[in-house]
Amino acid sequence: MSTNFFSGNADLVELFDRVIPWSRVVRAVEGPSSDPAETVSTWREILDTAGRYIGTEVAPRAARIDEIGVIREDGSVRMNEPMTESLRGLAQMGLASPAAPAELGGGGLPFTVNMILAEMLARADLATQVQHGIGWNSPAALIVRFGSEEQQRKYVPRLARGEIMGAVAMTEPQAGSDVGRLTTTATREGDCWILRGRKQFISAGQGEMVIVLARCVPGSSGLDGLGMFVAERDGGNYTVERAEHKFVIRGSPTCALVFEGTRATILGEPGDGWRQILTFMNESRLGVGIQGIGVAQAAYERAMAYAGERVQMGKPIREHPMVADMLLEMETIVAGSRTLAYEAAVLQDLAMFGKDEQAARDVRELTPLVKWYCTEGAVRACRLALQVHGGVGVVDEYDVGRYMRDSLILPIYEGTSQIQSLMAVKDLMKAVLRRPASLVGRGPSRMLARVQLGCRLGRDVAAARSNAVGTIRMLLGRIVRANGIGVLRGAALTEEQLGPILLHAERLTESLAHTHVARALGERAKLVPDRLPLAERAARTARLVSERNRRAVALDDGSVLEQVAGWRAERGRSERS
């Protein structure tokens, strides 16, 4: 097993060298006069150097970081020493805030390259990657994008040097995915703003500063009237109340923060907060998908190595067909996740730097699918790795137990898999209602519509697409029959009327995600023909998954929605009494 997490990862190198359209990324990021070959060579050298450090220094500390966990002494919360040492090395390499502009001390790297670095870190130790991404990268990116020149000069160089660590505080005890319920307030007093409220589940919350989402327009509600604010902790300006005791990413402090008269400065203008935080959330969801790839890669490599060494019944266990099937499923998950996620990362660069409107629409379509597939896939890959290891899989020295534990947070934070499903299906239904005729053709997805039928791979992907479109047609038909043809003319519907779609959103998302993975691997196989068997395997899986989900929707007996209606009525009676 190579200790260079870039050059030693054949699938990642193949994607970098032969699949990712770097010339488009370079032109978008650095302008049409730049030299793509020279720029990409520089990026490759950075990743190779980082991959060597991560493989030789960060990965060996992972078990110890997990064992020690967060340090809680004398009322303070801090990272443990192995974690600190790993992050110190990254800062010394100039990789604390690799996406921040070079003129502010950052690496000036595009989103795609930054995500490759994130994947390697997550493979080595997910907790360390969380601290790096949320503690340094995210605050710097938000301040660069929305802060004043003064705020940029004050904070970004210090974040980029690793002198301070920040966080992004959005979640509250009563406001998780339902952001509009937050109650933390910001009140203008002279030249500054005063924050009051509580935040919970804040990754890297032990740092020296934090970006806070708060309500700053009096009388506003929901997602209106929010703002983002920068607060420093120095002098007790806010309190790190505690770090949660958790069984996932144990080395990363997940903190509760208390703001009582906290002085802060605003990023941008009052009322811009939701628009601003949405950019962070969408990029973070792609980032969490990338985390899933790193964890799945680690689990897959351990399983492959063990299956080649462990002999049972006279042969290595990888030669037993059921074990081989598990290993091939893991390979498909990892390569499929990686191919789809970096397609989305490239689109993000084209949309963000190149102002490409079609890329923006495409990455919006892919983002919830990447978050869903890569994180659910990571859990599945870790579960398979545990099974391949048998009894020793639950022994700490084999690491797969840590991978399994850490993977479980991935489908939860930055929007659960179910929230991603609602997002994906909401946009899909908008597209269908704009163009109902798409349901008698190749469907509303432009990317899925370009699948060619000239081979078995294409036929399987087309069948999966047809199953997904048929599922949409079935669900929409139920709603039309119950509520009238006005639905197709944009009539507003209640949550109760949308029940069939809300119930089956995750099934539909699973079908769409698998179909997109098969499509992306098929397009990759055109560039790298050796990848055709892998793409065909993914296409067969997509066809089977979409058929299963279509049947599940067809056989729905309505009992779940009946139960929901009963609980809704019970709540209504309780509220009236």
Region spans (language model):
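Amphipathic, small/basic residue-rich leader segments at the start of a protein or domain
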Residues: M1-Q129, K154, R158, G558-R576
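Glycine-rich phosphate/cofactor-binding loops in nucleotide/flavin-utilizing enzymes
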Residues: S2-G31, S138, V392-A462, R543-S577
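Internal helix-loop-helix
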Residues: G51, N80-R153, P157, R161, ...
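Internal maturation/activation junctions in enzymes
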Residues: M83, G135-W136, G147, Q152-T184, ...
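A short core secondary-structure module
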Residues: C192, R196-Y238
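A glycine-rich, basic-preceded beta-loop-alpha segment at the flavin cofactor/substrate interface
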Residues: D234-E241, K246, P253-S284, E301-E319, ...
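C-terminal helix-coil-helix/basic helical segment that borders enzyme active sites and/or dimer interfaces
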Residues: A335-K371, L386-H389, A491-L502, G522-P529, ...
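C-terminal amphipathic alpha-helical interaction region
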Residues: R450-S577
